[in-house]
Structure formats: structure tokens, C-alpha cells
Amino acid sequence: MSSFLHDSPVLEAPPIPFDNSYARLPPQFFAEQAPTPVAAPRLIKFNSVLASELGLDAEVLERDGAAIFSGNALLPGSQPLAMAYAGHQFGGFVPQLGDGRAILLGEVIDRNGRRRDIQLKGAGPTPFSRRGDGRAALGPVLREYIVSEAMFALGIPTTRALAAVTTGQPVYREEALPGAVFTRVAASHIRVGTFQYFAARGDTDSLRILADYVVDRHYPEIKDRKNRYLALLDAVADRQAALIARWLHVGFIHGVMNTDNMTISGETIDFGPCAFMDAYDPATVFSSIDRQGRYAYANQPAIGQWNLARLGETLLPLIDPTLDTAVELANGIIKAYGERFQTYWLAGMRAKIGLATEEDSDLDLVQSLLAVMQEQEADFTLTFRRLGVLAASVDNEAAFAASFKDPLSVAPWLSLWRERLGRDPQSPAARAKAMLGVNPAFVPRNHRIEQAIAAAVEEDDFSLFEALLAVLAKPYEDQPAFAPYAEPPRPAERVLQTFCGT
């Protein structure tokens, strides 16, 4: 087993008490790379609550955050590096990708004893930059800050936002844009593509080191299993099935589910062209680069399975020395993923429509509601929220029916729903409370994100950004003062495409 996770001796208490296990792995896992300084950094947002959770000195970091989170100042104990990985991008394999604009500063052990990465995105070029400038524009940095923190508040496993800094210098894309650096916190940044990097090189020794490291760090409960590497594939499959089910429960579309954007830890990562669905349509795509709809809303579970199959391929030489046996064992897990996902998804959908018990007909009940929503172009988030309100009192039926173009279209479904509720033991009050706890009032709607970004980029005005963060921190509360944030966009406000950035 790997021994890279032992704690290093700490002689003093720096503002970030680094303990860098990944940097103790062999050199083929990364390239040492310091951030490139920027002209005039300015701290625009610092997550002091997360800093406290991580055991950091929030006071020092807020005071000196511009220099620290831009990469201009390197703290004691940091061992900056760019991680090596490969990946399938829209189905095509690229044997070397790696961190082209991200630099891992190091790791900390948080107050709950969990090891967490701290990474700068947009901190300058690395050996993996592939002719890129290694920089990030302000807009994508704000988008990732907003959406990752919103996902956390929704209760979905995700990377976190620790800080955002403007650089005082432009980045050049189709036009000159203000530059920024994003500080991301993750359980780790190990991806399916990290395994693919070594598999593509036939480097089984490094694969074994990586797999043992991942078991130590993320899945210590399986380290003594008879077939540790098969158990690893199974554990990752379970977390991914649960994660993607949660995405669907809130109408989230990742947008670029390449294997280099799928974490081994089971966290959502890389929010470049992501978006939340307004009107329900399972074929919804927002990403400008997803021209074939590969990563559409309803395709996400199948893509998760496809990505897991790619992970399984890399683990074959570790699972069993006989290839046919290894393939058979791995295939068993990959094939079981669909049923596993369906179990997680249906459990969540039962909760969304207020069911505490299970009946075989529940799937039909859920699917028939979704069919009416699609036909009527009903807003995904608002419809389920209003259903929770309706569960509290029949007086709220008109508001629920108003989610549909033809309010009468949902009446047959409501009759079936009420009949089913009659066989469910919850009281109306308990049911409504439970439903409002899983059906958010607020999600980061695309038009609100774009408004916040436009104000920041064009006017240096971060008030909309701050307001949006405040609303999204309490997604399951009604917040009457912010009721407009719960509404879908007007036709002129609709965002039809999102773009990669960070």
C-alpha cells in the first residue's frame, strides 16, 4: 500500500498549514510549476467560512489574499505543481492533457480530518498548457464561484470556491477581457483521466501507485478487500451514480463530461459551460461546443457509465492478471451501474413528489409528470417547488397549475398523485416540509449569472454577484425579498448557450 499520506512535521502555524501528499508521489505524476505573478491583483471575494472549515488563518488570508490567491506570494509549505492526466474529450482520446492553467498549491487536513486540495486556476502557463496562456477571464471565474457554492448549498458533492482575484491585466480570447484567478478546494483533483494517462503509457507500476493512493485517500474502507482494485471501481461507480442522479434532481447540466472532468472522489468539478435547465426538456444542451448533444441533460447517466467503462479499462491489469477474467469482473460493475443509478434517481424523484413509501407504479407517476412538464414547457425548478407548496394546502393548486401553459393539462396527473398520497403515511404538514427541503426555490439560473458577470466585467460592479451568492446560499428557503430570483427568465433574458472558460 501507498505510504504517501503520512503527515509531515509542522514547525509553525502558517496561514495555510500545508501537508502535500500528492507532491510526495513519484515525479511522473506532475510537473513542478510555480504560479506566474500578475500585475495588480485585487481580492474580490474570499470565503471565510470555508477557510475556517479548512483550518486556515482567515484573518491573514483576507488581509493578504490578493497576493496569495493570485500566485504572487507563495506561502511556506506550498509545493506548487501541475498534475498530469489524459482524457476522452467528446469521445476522442487525448493521451496528454494535464493542468494547462491550474496549479495545485498543496493540501491541508481540514477540521474534520479530511484531506483537501487547494488549487489556483488561471495562475499562468504550465508544461501542459499546449500553447495556451494559462490564464482565466473574470467571467468564467465568477461563474465557477457562483455555481460551485450553489451546488454545495443544494447538498450536492462539489468542489468549492475559496477565493477570486482580479489580476489587473487582460486575457485575450475573441476580445480582451479582464483576467482573474480562482482558488478551488477539492477532495482531490484526481480524475478518470489521471488513470488513463498511465494506462496509455503501459505504466502499470504507476497505475498501482495511483490506485493505492486513491484507496488510502478516498476509500480507506476498501483497503483490506480481497480485490482492492475491483472494489475501487465499484466504489467510484456508486459515487458517480449517486452524483449524477442528484444533478438530474435539480436540473443541472454539466456540459462537458469528458473523462478528465470526472473526479474519482465523486465531486462535481469543472463548471465551464454548465447550466441549470429552465423549461423541462430532457434534450436540453447549453454548451456551445456540444454540437451533437452528447452531454445533454438526459444523456448524463449514460455518459457517466461510459466514463466508468474507461476507468475500468485502466484498472484491468490490477484487477486480475488474466485479461478475460479482469474484463468479466469489471463488466459486472459497469453493467450494474444503470440499475444503481436508477435506484438513486427514483428515490430522489419520489422525495420530490412527496412519497415516503415505495410502490411499483411510482416510476410511471414520475414519468407522466415529466411528460406533461415537457409538453407544457413547465419550468423545472418552479414546478417542483410549487408542488411542495401544494402539498401543504389544496388552496395552492392554482399557483401550481400556473406553471403549465394550459393549467388544465396537469389535472389528470394531480388526481393520480392525490390517490397515491392517500396510500402514503405522512401527514400533509410533514410531507410539505420534506418536499420543500428537496425542491429548491432558488438555483443559479443562467440569466442571473450572466447579469452578474456583465456588471462585473463591464462596470467593475460586483453587487449583483454578491446578491446572487447570498440568495443561493439558502436555496430551500423562500426569501420573499428575493422572489424575482426564483422566477424563470423572460423570453428576452433566456440564455441559449454557455461557453468554456476556466
Curated annotation (Swiss-Prot):
Active site, UniProt feature: D260 (proton acceptor)
Transmembrane segments annotated in the record for this chain: none
Keywords assigned: ATP-binding, Magnesium, Manganese, Metal-binding, Nucleotide-binding, Nucleotidyltransferase, Transferase
Residues that bind Mg(2+): N261, D270
Cofactor(s) for this UniProt protein: Mg(2+); Mn(2+)
Top-level lineage group: Bacteria
Record PANTHER family: PROTEIN ADENYLYLTRANSFERASE SELO, MITOCHONDRIAL
Binding site for ATP: G98, G100, R101, K121, D133, G134, R184, R191, D270
Gene: ydiU
The name this protein goes by in its record: Protein nucleotidyltransferase YdiU
UniProt-listed InterPro entries: Kinase-like_dom_sf (IPR011009), SelO (IPR003846)
Catalytic reaction equation(s): L-seryl-[protein] + ATP = 3-O-(5'-adenylyl)-L-seryl-[protein] + diphosphate; L-threonyl-[protein] + ATP = 3-O-(5'-adenylyl)-L-threonyl-[protein] + diphosphate; L-tyrosyl-[protein] + ATP = O-(5'-adenylyl)-L-tyrosyl-[protein] + diphosphate; L-histidyl-[protein] + UTP = N(tele)-(5'-uridylyl)-L-histidyl-[protein] + diphosphate
Any one GO molecular-function label of the UniProt entry: ATP binding
